[in-house]
Amino acid sequence: MTPYNPHGDLCLSIFADVYATGALVFPPNARVLEIGCAEADWQTPMLALRPDLQITGVDWRKAKRPGTTIQGDILTQDFAPGSFDVVVGISSIEHIGLGHYEADPKYLDGDVTCMADVAQWLAPGGWAYLDIPYNAAGYEVLNTEARIYDDRALAERLTPLGLREAGRWYADRSGRFLGTTAPEPRPAHSFDYVALLLTR
């Protein structure tokens, strides 16, 4: 069983707030990939509303979720191009490749590789939702824990992949939803959150 993690709940509440804006529209019978499915359980309530969704989750840790779950490394998955209409990453991309979780191999550019995979796995017209740590003051890696992104780091990763920002929302460290109002820069080793809606 995965230990209780209030950080996962906080990021799930950000997803719920963005979903409530009406910006995240799941097409009928959408094929959905969740990257890092062991903690933030949005699948159960979503499938109660939308039983037509076909959700596949991938995580290093064992996860019992509705839909299909794959225990393993997202970077070794060989999904065909265009396999998914929607990709969801709730507080996951920033951890990939840092070796934080048991048996999680180190890939220095794990987040970059994963974002490139997401761009390939998305079907034309598909969208991806990512919520990640954010600090306008600068990009930073917190040991093996997580990456904190700024606007430059995001642009460097997303622009070459042909992923376009279709929406951006913020939440502060406590999870208070700020909508489209960017938070003030924070000191080093501190962050808020940004949620991105990306399209191809």
Regions found by a protein language model. Name each.
Residues 1-82, 90, 116:
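Conserved N-terminal segment of class I S-adenosyl-L-methionine
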Residues 106-127:
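A short glycine-rich, Lys/Arg-flanked "PGG" loop and its adjoining helix->strand segment in the class I
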Residues 98-111, 139-147:
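Short, flexible/disordered intra-domain loops and linkers
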Residues 88-93, 97:
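A conserved beta-strand element that flanks and buttresses the S-adenosyl-L-methionine
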Residues 150-200:
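Class I S-adenosyl-L-methionine
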Residues 130, 136-156:
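Acceptor-substrate binding/catalytic loop of class I
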Residues 27, 123, 159:
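Short conserved AdoMet
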